[in-house]
């Protein structure tokens, strides 16, 4: 029998439901159980693909091309299990599907209502395709009391009534704030949050309480009494110094044991957490450190680069060093000399982005790295800007630019209008909608056998995830390669450039894909592993 754990949040947003879900999944997985993670997002966007990264954070792209919530990145990194478009749904997607069916006449003239039609669609999503799993963990985005979330809470309430007795658990993540003047953790916000949850028919079975200090026994007893949960089900979720300590912290607090006790399951084995302990040891006790500059467009919200920062951490774990990050807004380099900002740093990374704002700053960062032999890693937009820099500075193409920024006589980067997905030809036009129309998901690439990037991968055939609408123009390949910028990887048909590298430079690599999306703490991506290794070499020269 498949068992369902619904993870809700209260008191404040951004408590870390995604991390809590991923950590619990890792603990259950370490006990030998088969686990699936899913996310319900109450916003009206069909997906986060057109949302501003400074509001919502990064868009996490799956192998099958879904643009999803960044929490799915946590799920993948903590469990190693690839997510798919079937693991994330929004209110917008639910409503779009229902309205499409209504227009088609599928409801045979019925009046379409939130209950039962919307709630039934949510339930169908949650319950579909779970027969092969022991546990399905479902995170509900937002906070209890948000009006947008009401249909989702009603749907999971109904699932609790309709599933066999003992097959559903409601876990509520909440906050116990510490008031210095009172000298104590306050339980009242949690009590009110649970009251709100109970008012819509859901009684939490477990309270996972975020706090910055131990919960006194009296406060546990009070929470158990007023929230109607067992005292043992009041679980402490202490703040930790790194997210990779969360599974071990939850294990120590007894979260996985309480989950099994709720389902009346006898633990078959103790969780095997050696690899988590090894990772934590490397994170907390590095043998050195390097500093990497991230020259980006959305540096005001670090979650806009969540997978990127984690992949850099993984590269540090692989090389047993701490990776310090220097965040630099790309627009700064459009009005100031990059040298004072980049001097003494050990590597420069220019990540993906969209639009003209900050583009010239990224180009100047690429030039600084090339001229001073500093390790450079350009991802997606960062690769495109590096190619434009080479076209202008090395090939003498003064007007080199991207058509993304407007009409240009030298379209070194242009709109991608046709590409192969497997055996099928996909097409896009300039007037296409923005949502869901990019080159999305996993695509294969072929690398040159004698290239630096092939050495890092350990082979010439790779598959990586993409999210882009523009592409480097292959018409400029010959003149750029003549100046030392090698097109070191292409699509299997040879039509689309996938990677470039400067010959003669210690480490200057650009990739059109997003390697950060496939990096794991236990399997650091080879490019991030190589980039940090190059940064270590650079640190010895500074």
From Swiss-Prot:
Alphabetized SUPFAM superfamilies for the sequence: Class I glutamine amidotransferase-like, P-loop containing nucleoside triphosphate hydrolases
Designated gene of the protein: pyrG
Binding site for UTP: 13, 186-191, 222
EC number: 6.3.4.2
Protein name in UniProt: CTP synthase
Gene3D superfamilies linked to this entry: 3.40.50.880, P-loop containing nucleotide triphosphate hydrolases
Domain Glutamine amidotransferase type-1: 291-541
MF annotations from Gene Ontology: ATP binding; CTP synthase activity; glutaminase activity; identical protein binding; metal ion binding
Family membership noted in the UniProt record: Belongs to the CTP synthase family.
Coiled-coil parts of chain: none
Entry annotated with the keyword Ion transport: no
PROSITE patterns reported for this sequence: GATASE_TYPE_1
Other noteworthy facts: CTPSs have evolved a hybrid strategy for distinguishing between UTP and CTP. The overlapping regions of the product feedback inhibitory and substrate sites recognize a common feature in both compounds, the triphosphate moiety. To differentiate isosteric substrate and product pyrimidine rings, an additional pocket far from the expected kinase/ligase catalytic site, specifically recognizes the cytosine and ribose portions of the product inhibitor.
